[in-house]
Every structure is written in C-alpha cells, then in structure tokens.
C-alpha cells in the first residue's frame, strides 16, 4: 500500500507539472484507486498524458516495483503495444510518438523525435532527433542528431554516429563515439573515440582514442585520456591527465594535433608532438626528450636524460634550464 500511495503522489506531482488545458486526468480519481493495476488502467485511458505515464512506469521499473510479468498479466501484449510498451520481438516505431518504453530483450527502431526509455537487455536504434534514457544492460545505436542519456548505475553499451550526442553518467557503461558525434562523460564513465568525435570528460572519466580521425577531447577534474591518435586536439585542465601514444609502440607516431595542459594537469609524452601549450602549473613527462618550452610556472621533465625545464616567469620570458 505504501508503494501505491507513493505512486499516487508522483502522478499528482506530474499532473501539476505538465498541466495544460487539454489535461483530462483528475487527481481525485487518481487518489481513489485501490491498486497499482487499477491506477495504471485509469491513466492508460488518456493517451494525451503519455509524459506522465511513461515517467511513472520508468520510475517503477527502476525501483523494481513492477515487472514485465506483472505488466503482461495486467494488460496483455496488444494493450501494451498499443501504448508503445514493448517487451519482446523486433519493432519499428515512427510517426512522432513521444514516449516509448522498451523492456526485456525487445529490439526497436525509432525516429521522428521519439522519446524512449530502455530497460533490462533491450536494444534501441535511434534516428531523426530522437531521445533515449538508457538503463540497466540495454544497448543503443544513435544516429542523425539523436540524444542519449545513460543513467547512473547502468551497464549500458552504445555507439554514437552522425552528429548524435550522448551524456554518460555511469562508470559501468561503455560507449564508442563515431562520425562527428559528441560525448559528455561524468563519474568515471568511459568512451572510445573514433573518427571526428568531440569528447568532454569530467570527474575521473576515461577517454581512449583510436588512431584515425581528428577528434577533439576536453579533460576536466581528474579525467584521463589515453591517446593513440596523431591528429587529436587534447585540452587538459583541473588536474586531468593525457598519455600520448599510450601503447608505447616501437613505431612512434608523430602527433600533428595540438596538446594543451593547464591548471595542474599532467601530460605523458611517448611521441613527438608538433604543437604543445603548457601553462598554469602543468607538468609534462617527456619520454622523447625533445620538448623544452614551458610557460607560466610549468615543468617539462626529460625522463630518459633526467633533465628538467622549468619556467617561473611570464610567457615569452627567458626560460630556466635545470640539469640534475
């Protein structure tokens, strides 16, 4: 009964949040229902309240208050499909549906600005500016300006293409970024950058790059990048770390991109870099023993010859050379 009462409170709060002139759900009727099934039946009757319904089901699935078996027992497959709830099989859903729920092992392709919630082991192919909230062990493929939000504590796996965007909030999720897509990483999340992707990493997140494309990577707040891409543009700030040519291969790559470090960040170089900007207490560990132009209170350490370049003056002033 406590679960039912909490759901009623959530629904009433959403009714107030999304209240419009077309709103037909009555909070009095919501509060008079006696079971979760009866409550869902009442709300399902109003197709124009999809936002409220989808959020409520999503919340209860995440909290394991309801299950696939319960939904099937209460409503049946035909009823659920009619309301864009899928729990097995393959489906193609277009036409501007704003709320789709994918459960179990269902596979679905959606487009036309759809809003999708995925759970369990489902698979979602997003196109045409659709939006996905990915949970549990679901899999996604995002295309054509779609947006994906990987929810906390999930183990989602996904790929982004064609100007799509993903925000990853889970350290158990793993994303591959392709073809001009953009990724935001938080809380120890991980991504592999392919092609011309743009990555913004925060809060101990990890970025790995392939050796193709012209990726742009921004690291903040202890984020780490392992870079094997000679054309990468990497910006390190706020105690972040970039490791260039992390596999330390025999055939060293020539980095033609730009490496920037500032705000107590760390760069480890195993390859020669054409353009490097180091300032604001950043440190470079140079295993090639070639770079010697630090700026503004920064260190460049030659790791083989055990020499250090250090500048305590302003950019452009004479450098100080320290030899151990």
Language-model regions, residue ranges each:
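Short, glycine-biased loop/turn motifs at secondary-structure junctions and
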Residues: 1-324
């Amino acid at each position: 009964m406590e679960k039912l009462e909490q759901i009623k409170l959530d629904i009433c709060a959403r009714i107030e949040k999304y209240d419009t002139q077309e709103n037909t759900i009555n909070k009095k009727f919501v509060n008079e229902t006696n079971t979760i099934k009866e409550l869902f039946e009442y709300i399902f009757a109003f197709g124009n309240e999809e936002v409220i319904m989808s959020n409520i089901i999503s919340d209860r699935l995440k909290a394991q208050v309801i299950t696939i078996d319960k939904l099937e027992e209460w409503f049946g497959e035909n009823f659920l499909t009619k309301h864009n709830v899928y729990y097995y099989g393959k489906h193609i859903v277009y036409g501007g549906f704003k709320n789709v729920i994918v459960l179990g092992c269902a596979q679905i392709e959606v487009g036309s600005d759809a809003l999708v919630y995925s759970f369990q082991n489902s698979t979602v192919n997003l196109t045409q500016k659709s939006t996905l909230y990915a949970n549990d062990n679901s899999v996604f493929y995002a295309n054509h300006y779609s947006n994906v939000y990987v929810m906390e504590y999930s183990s989602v796996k996904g790929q982004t293409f064609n100007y799509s965007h993903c925000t990853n909030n889970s350290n158990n999720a793993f994303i591959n970024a392709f073809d001009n897509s953009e990724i935001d990483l938080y809380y120890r999340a991980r991504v592999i950058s392919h092609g011309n992707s743009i990555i913004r990493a925060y809060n101990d997140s990890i970025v790995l790059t392939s050796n193709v494309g012209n990726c742009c990577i921004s690291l903040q707040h202890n984020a780490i990048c392992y870079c094997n891409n000679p054309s990468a543009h990497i910006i390190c700030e706020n105690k972040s770390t970039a490791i260039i040519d992390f596999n330390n291969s025999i055939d060293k790559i020539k980095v033609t991109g730009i490496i920037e470090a500032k705000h107590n960040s760390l760069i480890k170089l195993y390859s020669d870099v054409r353009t490097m900007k180091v300032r604001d207490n950043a440190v470079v560990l140079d295993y090639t023993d070639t770079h010697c132009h630090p700026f503004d209170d920064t260190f460049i350490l030659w790791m083989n010859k055990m020499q250090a370049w250090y500048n305590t003056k302003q950019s452009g002033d004479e450098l100080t050379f320290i030899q151990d």
